[in-house]
Amino acid sequence: MAAGTVCFYLVEGQMEEKAVKILKGNYILSGKVSVLHQRKISNTLLRLIPRKSKVIIVFDTDAADTEHTLYENLNMLQRENIETVLIPQVNNFEDEIIYATSIKNIKELLNSKSNSDFKSDFLKEKNCLKKLEDKDFDIYKFWSRTADKSSSFSKYENRSNKIKKL
């Protein structure tokens, strides 16, 4: 990465925000994190992004109706000459965790009572990184896949290798 370049993560939701925060430094490049919740980048947020930035957009591929918003956000960043790195989550954050660890079901990671309890358990957990590493977390697998060819997101190349400390 060029000297003076700042990473700015725009993520899907709170779980991705926490993931970036726990992975940065050890596994991925450090940077600021903002949650988009599948919304268009506001002018206010755009002004907060430094000129020499690398914007990393982490997005789910299981909601086809959000592809147009992603497309608009990319165009906005390109008009501002801001470098972008796209990271599709196939299909969502939980599926990425399962793929990158030795667990078969997401509730196994934190011994959640149910899959639906996992989100709140993950957000409350103080030792997420250790829990991931205890389940054989593999950064080479995490955020490494591309969307299925039948998905409207398949045209977006996964460039997670640009932010991983390999």
What are these regions (language model features)?
Residues 34-35:
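A short, aromatic/hydrophobic, helix- or strand-capping loop or linear motif
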Residues 41:
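Nucleic-acid-processing active sites and adjacent nucleic-acid-binding tracks
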